[in-house]
Amino acid sequence: MRIAYDVDGNAIEQYIKSSSSSIVNTQFSRTIRYIETQSQYNEIPTSITDLLFANGFGSTLYQSLNFPLFENLTTIDFGEESFSEVATLSISGLNKLQSLIFRKNSFTFSKNSYAERTNRQLTIKNCPDLTTISFGDYSFSDYHSIQLQNLNSLISVTFGEYCFYYSNFTFSCMI
């Protein structure tokens, strides 16, 4: 059983993972997909609204990551210690995206630590409905650059300890 949470940490539902790890929440008109395996990732429907990655997912699978085909996404939740080898993450043009959650030690080689790697970059731009971004402790701790651009609805950005420790920040066209 897994409990899904909204961005404030409130439980919105409980469900038992099916073989497809996909559920439809009729109360909120949302389709949630919990990703634990590479094959589940490869089969994500473009109509998905909520994407939740398991702890440790994608740690050695990807060098870069983006989500251009998922125009209905409202939430992306990256589990703890996920996507450690991704050097470039770009989240752009997701017009319905409202919430991004990066859990502890996600997108970092330096688990519970920090080190400078000049080739790692995060870009989040052109997501007009994005209101909340949350970075867990040590997430992106070894990234060199973060760029947030054209996020007109952004209300809250929360940084845990040691996130983007060596980064240059660029916040532009935020309102």
Model-derived features: positions:
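Conserved hydrophobic position(s) of the canonical leucine-rich repeat
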Residues: 48, 62, 73, 86, ...
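Residue-level signal for glycine
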Residues: 9-13, 148
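Leucine-rich repeat
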Residues: 60-63, 100-103, 129-136, 154-160
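Position-specific detector for the leucine-rich repeat
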Residues: 57, 71, 82, 95-96, ...
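N-terminal segments that cap or nucleate solenoid repeat domains
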Residues: 19-81
